A protein has these predicted regions:
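Central antiparallel beta-sheet cores of small beta-barrel/beta-sandwich binding domains
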Residues: 15-96, 100, 105-142
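Bacterial N-terminal signal peptides
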Residues: 1-10
């Protein structure tokens, strides 16, 4: 009886809450961009932007040193609502990140500024909707 009560007590405290769906790195190969995130602990430090401290995450690009910083993230099920600002604080937007049934993620701008990156000295607008995937782990011994 005590074991049942103990197990129910732990279960009731949310022992098995999701802490991985919106944590880690996801990538978009077409635009060569990625998202680094931990919406559960809000403990991501943006490289080169340490002045912001720990944040829920950021959007980075392989060909641009600028970052779009996630200043707020609210997770509800398979979706996260985000408040994002550029690293100068001059542009911001609200977006939604959704885990799709096929395991991909969709970032959708809901309102506000269009995200942009620099490629070859020219500004490139990021589409209103963009699909991301988790990177494939490689075996270093292979």
């Amino acid at each position: 009886m005590a074991l049942v009560v103990s197990v129910l007590s732990v279960w009731g405290q949310g022992c098995c809450a999701d802490t991985v769906t919106f944590a880690g790195r996801i990538e978009n190969a077409e635009y060569q961009v990625w998202i680094e995130m931990d919406f559960y602990h809000n403990d991501v430090v943006t490289p080169g932007q340490e002045i912001f401290g720990q944040v829920p995450g950021y959007f980075g690009a392989k060909r641009d040193t600028r970052k779009w910083i996630f200043v707020d993230a609210e997770v509800k099920g398979k979706q996260a609502r985000l408040v994002i600002t550029n690293d100068y604080g001059s542009e911001d937007l609200e977006a939604r990140l959704t885990l799709e049934r096929d395991g991909t993620y969709t970032l959708e701008r809901l309102k506000g500024s269009t995200m942009k990156i620099v490629v070859g000295g020219k500004w490139v607008n990021i589409p209103k909707k963009l699909t991301f995937k988790r990177p494939v782990a490689t075996d270093p011994t292979a």
